[in-house]
């Protein structure tokens, strides 16, 4: 059994039609006292200019629904791909390097210790102390 799937454009149009048809709400307390209240505006008289504007608005709203947001620009994507390729290829091409001197290894450790000390050090500004009291 082969089932055909409808295309995405028809699904979007069907969802929009269902949404616009379901704007009628039931209002009332009991089963017999329900009233149909329509919150839709009456359609304005259609002129050729209005219909063109409506058609443009429909197409632009469909484009916004269908196109996902781009998180990376083209330049940042090229940089990301280039950096990834270099990190994969350079270790295979370069010869193994000797370890750095011991004193050079202490530099990042010293920077980390300095940042930890500065993070827990109280500030000397009385204004900053007032700000921290309001949050505690």
Swiss-Prot record:
Please state where this protein is localized. Answer: Membrane; Nucleus; Cytoplasm; Endoplasmic reticulum
Q: Which domain of life is it from?
A: Eukaryota
- Write down any Gene Ontology CC term: membrane
TM regions (residue ranges): 77-97, 101-121
Q: Which UniProt keywords apply?
A: Cytoplasm, Developmental protein, Endoplasmic reticulum, Membrane, Nucleus, Transmembrane, Transmembrane helix
Annotated membrane topology is: Multi-pass membrane protein
Extract the signal peptide range.
Answer: none
Task: Enumerate the Gene Ontology biological process terms.
Answer: cellular response to auxin stimulus; positive regulation of cell population proliferation; positive regulation of organ growth
Q: In which tissues is it expressed?
A: Mostly expressed in cotyledons and young siliques and, at low levels, in roots, rosette leaves, leaves, inflorescence stems and flowers.
User: How are the domains described in the entry?
Assistant: The OSR domain is sufficient to promote organ growth.
Q: Which family does the entry's similarity section mention? A: Belongs to the plant organ size related (OSR) protein family.
Main function: Promotes cell proliferation-dependent organ growth.
**Protein name as it appears in the record:** Protein AUXIN-REGULATED GENE INVOLVED IN ORGAN SIZE
Q: Which organism is it from?
A: Brassica rapa subsp. pekinensis (Chinese cabbage)
- Gene name linked to the record: ARGOS
């Amino acid at each position: 059994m082969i089932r055909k799937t409808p295309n995405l454009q028809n699904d979007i149009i069907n969802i929009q039609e269902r949404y616009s048809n379901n704007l009628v709400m039931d209002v009332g307390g009991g089963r017999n006292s329900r009233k149909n209240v329509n919150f839709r505006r009456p359609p304005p008289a259609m002129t050729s200019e209005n219909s063109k504007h409506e058609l443009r608005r429909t197409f632009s709203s469909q484009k916004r629904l269908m196109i996902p947001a781009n998180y990376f620009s083209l330049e940042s994507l090229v940089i990301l791909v280039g950096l990834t390729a270099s990190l994969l290829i350079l270790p295979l091409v370069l010869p193994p390097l000797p370890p750095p001197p011991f004193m050079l290894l202490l530099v990042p450790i010293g920077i980390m210790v300095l940042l930890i000390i500065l993070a827990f050090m109280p500030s000397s500004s009385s204004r900053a102390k007032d700000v921290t009291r309001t949050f505690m």
